[in-house]
């Protein structure tokens, strides 16, 4: 996971001994944008004013966002935390997963039902991409 080296989380990541990667459904895009772009690195509580509420992970020492469709619970590998070019890179061990019951069937996890926006930022701009069930066979492009 990468984060701005000057951010609140970057300052705490080595001491909290746990973090959750929360995947929120597209219905939360307003809250996602507010936390990510408006509050960003300027506030310790970047979720203030978003309406998001939090629970406590039972697996790692970290909060999780109530309403997240999918959560990955991790512990940082402190000897593998590297800061380079203003970005703190944190390697972690996955300790658990949480997901909405509607995403599970007798056949396993239903990726096609997962409705989370994927944020992409590059020199062309910043966009949210939606997950779909469309696929392309690997190796079919050459």
Region locations from a protein language model:
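Basic, polyanion-binding surface patches
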Residues: 1-142
């Amino acid at each position: 996971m990468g984060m701005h080296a000057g951010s609140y989380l970057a300052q705490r990541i080595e001491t909290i001994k746990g973090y959750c990667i929360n995947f929120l459904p597209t219905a939360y895009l307003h809250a996602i944008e507010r936390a990510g772009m408006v509050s960003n690195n300027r506030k310790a509580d970047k979720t203030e004013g978003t309406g998001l509420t939090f629970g406590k992970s039972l697996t790692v020492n970290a909060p999780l966002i109530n309403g997240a469709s999918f959560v990955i619970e991790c512990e940082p590998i402190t000897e593998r935390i590297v800061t380079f070019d203003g970005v703190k890179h944190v390697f972690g061990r996955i300790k658990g997963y949480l997901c909405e019951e509607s995403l599970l069937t007798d056949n396993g996890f239903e990726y096609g039902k997962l409705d989370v926006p994927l944020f992409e930022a590059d020199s062309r701009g910043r966009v949210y991409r939606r997950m779909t069930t469309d696929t392309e066979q690997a190796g079919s492009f050459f």
